[in-house]
Amino acid sequence: MAEFHRIIIDTDTAGDDAAALIIAAKNPNIEILGVTVLAGNVSLEQGAKNALAVLELIDDPTPVYMGASTTFSGEEKTCFSVFGADGMGEADLIHPRSKPQEKNAVDFILETVRANPGEIEIVALGPATNLALAIQRDRETMLKVKRIWAMGSAGFGPGNATPVAEFNVYKDAPAYKMMIELGVPLTILGLDMNNEFTWLYAEELQEMRSGNKIQQFMANCTRKLLEFKQRNGIPAVDFPDALAMACLAWPDFVEETTLCSASCITEPGETYGMLIFYKAGHTYDSMPTIVGKPNISVVSKVKSSEFVKRMNAVFLS
């Protein structure tokens, strides 16, 4: 029998976040208690509108809460999205009728975990600012999170924000450092799991434009991403956030994880935002004393060839 998950989704809602939301909302073994939003791919306000629009698309009443508009240190975030200015393909898709809740995202996270100790899992699809603010305010409560699932880091491969740093970590490395050092069980999916077998190609997207309302939405919200990828010689779009959600939603999807401890580079310079993983049981010539006990399961093998088929099945359900 599949494990039941009670989750909070923390997101900077763009196209691949939309796919992740849909995968979670349509899974009978997942209860989404709330969607918390922060600035990242797009501004906080735009991210909230995007989340509301996606939930309305699938008739899901999950409440949306607005969180951090700046970095953990209070600096304004320069938002950039390969999904277009609105994070959703600039296809005039985002006209939500509902509004976010008045309660702040950090308050919601802490109240929910406090009321359900050891039961709540958090799926972090964007920068970790909301989680860092929650940790700063009430670390003892955040230690009662059952598990954090995160799309972040380059895994054991190259980055996308820089050669060594992935976007979510790079946008607020001090916040990510706080998250990985909290000490609760943490599963991280990095960019190295995002390969050509997990992409949707231009021909498939064109077919989806004649499909149901979810398929049409997903094909259109990834329009700008496809243009960006094609300019770089790739005739397809990728879904790293949806891959991260798949690790939670589909129990057999993850074939291998590597237990690690980690450090996050927060000092300015070429390696800023790099997440360095130290494999448990592996002997290194020089092991930094700042690295704690292994508590991070880094996803190192998934059923890549199954991903698109399963995601499309969700869109059709």
Residue locations for each model-derived region?
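Metal-dependent C-N hydrolase catalytic cores
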Residues: H5-I7, A48-A115, K293-K303, N312, ...
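A residue-level signal for conserved active-site and pocket-lining positions in enzyme catalytic cores
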Residues: V64, M179, M245
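Active-site histidine-anchored catalytic micro-motif
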Residues: A2-A53, D92-N195
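Short glycine- and Lys/Arg-enriched binding-loop motifs that mark or flank ligand-binding interfaces
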Residues: D10, P63, F80, I122, ...
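Short, surface-exposed amphipathic charged segments that create phosphate/polyanion-binding patches used
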Residues: K77-G84, T162-E166, L205
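Short, well-ordered secondary-structure micro-motifs
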Residues: E75-K77, N160-A161, T198-Y201
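Conformational coupling and interaction surfaces
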Residues: A2-F4, I22-E31, Y170, P174, ...
